[in-house]
Amino acid sequence: EDVPQPPVSQFYIQGQVYCDTCRARFITELSEFIPGAGVRLQCKDGENGKVTFTEVGYTKAEGLYNMLIERDHKNEFCEITLISSSRKDCDEIPTEGWVKPSLKFVLNTVNGTTRTINPLGFLKKEVLPKCPQVFNKLGMYPPNM
């Protein structure tokens, strides 16, 4: 017999922020994780679109961030957005193409109490010299290099 569980009142959101050193718009072997980068979590009501929750977090070693959310955000849509980079050479927020500066998700107990979000990346101003070799290995043409 199933015993009803009390509602979960805490969630952890975790993810990573990286420097896209090849401006590939995805992680490559040359990508570097950024400690000290800022991200914002914002949740909105699924029916009226009003903001219900906002939290800012910063990455630690290996570009990891971890946020504690104090209640279940059922029927809400949440979004993690890049807000700041600790690296002046890698602080461009991507706005073009299929990569967005944020990730959207639904936060609920169906997926457990820890939610791992896909990595978000800042674009490096100048690509690394080894980037063409990385794209060649992947069988791809470099984007606008």
Curated annotation (Swiss-Prot):
The record gives the effect of mutating I83L as: In Lig v 1.0102
List S-S links within the chain.
C19-C90, C22-C131, C43-C78
Task: Note the effect listed for N66S.
Answer: In Lig v 1.0102
Location in the cell reads:
Secreted
Q: Which PROSITE patterns match?
A: OLEEI
Residues with an annotated glycan are N111
- Which Pfam families does the annotation name? Pollen_Ole_e_1
Resulting phenotype, V51I: In Lig v 1.0102
Q: What is its main location?
A: secreted
List the keywords (alphabetical): Allergen, Disulfide bond, Glycoprotein, Secreted
Q: What is the effect of changing K60R?
A: In Lig v 1.0102
Q: Which InterPro entries match?
A: Allergen_Ole_e_I_CS, Pollen_Ole_e1_allergen
Cellular component GO terms, alphabetical: extracellular space
Give the family this protein belongs to, as stated in its UniProt record: Belongs to the Ole e I family.
Name recorded for this polypeptide: Major pollen allergen Lig v 1
Higher taxonomy: Eukaryota, Viridiplantae, Streptophyta, Embryophyta, Tracheophyta
